[in-house]
Amino acid sequence: MACALAAPDQRRQVKAVHLGHLHIQQRQRDIAVLQQQLQRLAGLTPEEAGWDGTVMPAEGDKLPPGEVPAWRTRVQYAIDADGRVGLRKHRSHDVEIIDECLIAAPGVSELGVEKQDWPQMATVEAISATGSHDRQVILTPREGGRLPLVELDKPVSVLRVDEKDGGVHRVHGRAFVRERADDRTYRVGSGGFWQVHPQAADTLVRAVMQGLLPRKNDMALDLYCGVGLFAGAIGQRIGEKGAVLGIESGKRAVEDARHNLKDLDRVRIEHGKVDQVLPRTGITECDLIVLDPPRAGAGKATVKHLSGLGARRIAYVACDPAALARDLAYFRDGGYKVRTLRAFDLFPMTSHVECVAILEPAAKGL
C-alpha cells in the first residue's frame, strides 16, 4: 500500500495511504460514498438518517488546508530483501523505500525505525500508545530469519511473530501497551485491537455515550467488545445496580477486557462469537446495546436477534459504510429507526470513515 502524496512544500511524500492524490478533497469523497451507500442499501437520505452531511475531523486534526496530520500510532513497515525500510505499494508486493512517514504519530516517528536496517525481517510494526509512554515493535522474520539486535532511539518492548503458528511472542519488555481513554487505562495485548488514531477512542466514546444516554440501573450489551472500551464507559455510568455484558471472540482481548474492568463488578465479559454466545445467555430484554462489529457488519440474523430485545437505544459503530447501511436496513425491518448518525475522519487521507449511528424503536420518540 503506497500512494505518494505531494505535501504542501511539494517535496515530501506520504506513503501507505489510499487516495493520497485527493488530499483536501478526501473528506468530500467520504461524504459522497456514505451518502450513496445509505441511499442504495438502506433507502435513507441524510435527513432520514439524522446525518448533517459532514465528516468531522478528530480533535487535533483541524489543520490549515494542505497540512497533513501525523496520526498513525501504529505503522507496519515492509522490509525489502536488503533489510531496508519501506511500505508496500498499493495492491502490490513491491516495497517503496522511505526515510520517514509523515502520517506517523510523533511517538512512532521518534523510534527511528527507518534509520535502522532490518536484515531477515519481512515486516516491522511500530506502536506508540496514547496516554502512556509505552512503545512496542513487533518483528515478523522471513522464513528461517534470525532476530536482529534492536537499537532504537527510544526505550521499546520487542515482540516477534512466530512464522509457524502466527502467534505473537514477547522477546523483551511488556507483552502489552497501556492506552488511555475516557479517564481509564486499558491494557492492549500483543496483536490486540485498538483504534489507530490517538483521538479515536475518546471521540467514539463521547459519541456513543451522548447517543445512548445511560441511566442508573440500566442493563446493557457491548457486542464485539474488544478490550472493553465501551463496556467500561457504560459501566461507569449506570451505577452499582446496573449491568453490562460484553461479548468478544478474541481470547487475548477477553483476558485484557477482564483485566481492564476488574474494578467494575457490574461488568461481565464472555468469550465467543456474538451469534453463538448471545442466544445462550437467555437474555430476553435489555436497555442499551452498543455493537462495533468487524468490517463485514453484524449480519441479518444477529440484527434480528438484537431487534427483539427491546433496547431503548442502540449504538452502532462502523468503519465500513456499506456494512453499516445493510445492517441499518435490517434494523428497520426489526422495528428500529435511525435517530442520529455522525461520521468521523479517524483515518485521514484514506478511503475509510468511522460512523456512529444511534437507533431507537420506530414507535417511540425518546
PLM feature spans:
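Short linear motifs in low-complexity or flexible loops
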Residues: A2-A7, A16
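Accessory RNA-recognition modules of RNA-modification enzymes
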Residues: A32, L38-L291, T302-K304
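Short hydrophobic/aromatic residue motifs in ordered secondary structure
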Residues: Q26-Q28, G107, A200, R295, ...
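Hydrophobic alpha-helical signal/anchor motif
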Residues: V14-V17, I24, I31-V33
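S-adenosylmethionine
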Residues: E270-V353, I358-E360, K364-L366
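Intrinsically disordered, low-complexity segments enriched in small polar residues
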Residues: R11-Q13, R27-R29, R40
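Hydrophobic, low-acid, alpha-helix-prone terminal segments
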Residues: A7-R11, L34-Q37
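Local alpha-helix boundary/kink/capping signal
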Residues: P8-Q13, L22, G299-K300
